[in-house]
Amino acid sequence: MSENTTQENVFHTNIPSVLAMEFSIKPWQVENTVALLDEGATIPFIARYRKEKTGELDDQTIRNISDRLTYLRNLDERKQEVYTAILSQEKMTDEIEKSIGNAVTLAEVEDIYRPFKPKRKTRASIAKEKGLEPLAKIILEQNKKTVLAQILPQYINEEKGVLTVEDALKGAMDIIAEDVSDNPQVRTVLKKLYNRTGVVESKGDQEKESVYTQYYDFSQTVNKLPGHRVLALNRGEKEGFLKVNITVDLSAAVTEIEKIYIKGKNECADVVKEAIADSYTRLIHPSLDTETRNNLTDMANEGAIKLFGDNLRQLLLVPPVKDKVCLALDPGYRTGCKMAVVDATGKVLEVGVVYMTLPNHNKDIAKKTLKSLIKKHNVDIISIGNGTATKETEMFVASLIKELDKKISYMVVSEAGASVYSASKLAAAEFPDYDVSLRSAVSIARRLQDPLAELVKIDPKSIGVGQYQHDMPKARLEESLDGVVEYCVNTVGVDLNTASAPLLERVSGLNKTTAKNIVAYRE
């Protein structure tokens, strides 16, 4: 037993030292950054206004430090929980304590705790209740002098349900199988094997049509499977079209375990080999199949979230079209094409509906209406939403421009999220007298004039620049996308005289209350 048997926190990772090494920066930079994060300072604020404290670390590095800081603190906390749990069972040893201290991932800590974790009733636990654990230990020792035929009868106990020598041997093998399954060394070796040689396979019912037909007879190695395929397989499985599993060469896996357990050639070793084979197929493989797929999903999620963030950043940082009066068209068929004219500052001048596409089109009236608006408000540019009927609307506008006296241009802009914004409380407060569809037209005009200022009003997840966003961990996705929005706003800056409250609240050092107060004071 370790001398350190108190239940005080005995695991204190030198986090500044670890982070300094991981990020190749000075320990004092880490210490100051951690202190600022613990005080509640936001990452954009630290990156821009505390450069002297951090040694001019950029926002992405600070964000990465924040993520790792959280992980390492959780790791220390879990180490202590596991240490305390094993200690309470009076099974702590110096070796186990050292293993816990040396663990660098949560998965390693869980593998160490696995043999001590309270279990539901298992075949092994039932065998132990029947008094067969000593027999299992004898077999595991693999002493050449052990003769099973002589010792097995000693464990027959009718009262406990061990009626024959076969019952005794089977129970002992169940105990050995669970011991093998719970062995951290076994799991570490096999995880490497799964990551190196494992193959992800999926099967589907050829008679069922779906978007997953390419995965109906699919296989690819674990270490080469791209994230988007992981997420596609997960969704196909969730929707009931696919059956997905990981396969590993059985003999290779069993051989790796035997290297750890088998001590030579004898009768007991043969029994242990049989128990190892059972352990792998019944206990280890299902567990590692799940764990490996979870790891693949975690990596795929992180990759998808990063791609989502990169796409969002590009969209938010599209250069604005400044000082232009804009006519926006939100194309449609049956309900017509919604339009809005806004001045160079984004103020709405006029809204309406024209019918230039089937089935209710009247192109002559539509042209006359638009020409009148362009002349009345001295429109400089036309913004067309890229949704339904965009192609027809674009052709109509191109024809219209040729008939105008003044030089005017048009641009097709993304209307992703416009419908979400138009139905939001923010849009209702901004345009209480406008129909939802007309609010969308206003948004399409403004996102051409200043994409960042307009798009910050929309939930980043609704802008539609990422794959499988509904399969992502919601909190992690929101945290990442909020970070991107903050980065963009603070990189570009805002005009205090014109910026909206949603834009101002993204500025480092401001919040919803101060943003609203600024707008109220300005008005």
Predicted regions and their residues:
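Short, well-structured alpha-helical segments
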Residues: 30-35, 62, 97, 101, ...
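Amphipathic alpha-helical segments within well-ordered protein domains
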Residues: 17-20, 34, 47-50, 66, ...
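Active-site catalytic pocket residues across diverse enzymes, especially alpha/beta-hydrolases
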Residues: 50, 401, 522
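N-terminal cofactor/phosphate-binding cores enriched in small/glycine residues
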Residues: 26-60
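Short, well-ordered loop/turn and helix-capping segments at boundaries between secondary-structure elements
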Residues: 52-55, 141, 182, 450, ...
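Duplex nucleic acid-engaging cores and interfaces of nucleic-acid transaction enzymes
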Residues: 2, 61-64, 71, 75-328, ...
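Long, highly charged, low-complexity intrinsically disordered interaction regions
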Residues: 3-4, 12-15, 74-91, 101, ...
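Generic start-of-chain signal for non-secretory N-termini
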Residues: 1-31, 38
